[in-house]
């Protein structure tokens, strides 16, 4: 298994990815997150999690592991819909976009990501009625939200994340 990790992990981006399309490089590292959902109720659910990003495949892609509740939090705060998933983001020079796969237990999603202003928008490929948005991105924090398109064509936020770069 050690050889698998050595073959997968890479410590920098491949130079073929133009710097202006290196949207996800800022996320490489470990993040402490707060997941917030059930936004329609008076007391939304808040759960501590972790999000870990790394260059992989000789720097041609960025992979993450999304864990809510976090590994330590799971011991005390079990959630019936806990998520332990991974995303693989590969830059596509033909489209100047990122081709993305997200998978966790019971779900597999294909998305495409573009930068719009300062935000990174990942749109689900089949119906285009769900998207994820990274915003307010700095080297030490970012926000993320999951949105669904409603009947009138507007986007409703159904979940949010606040992320702080992990210390240590």
Task: Briefly describe each language-model feature range.
Residues 1-168:
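Hydrophobic small-molecule pocket/channel-lining residues, especially in calycin-type beta-barrels
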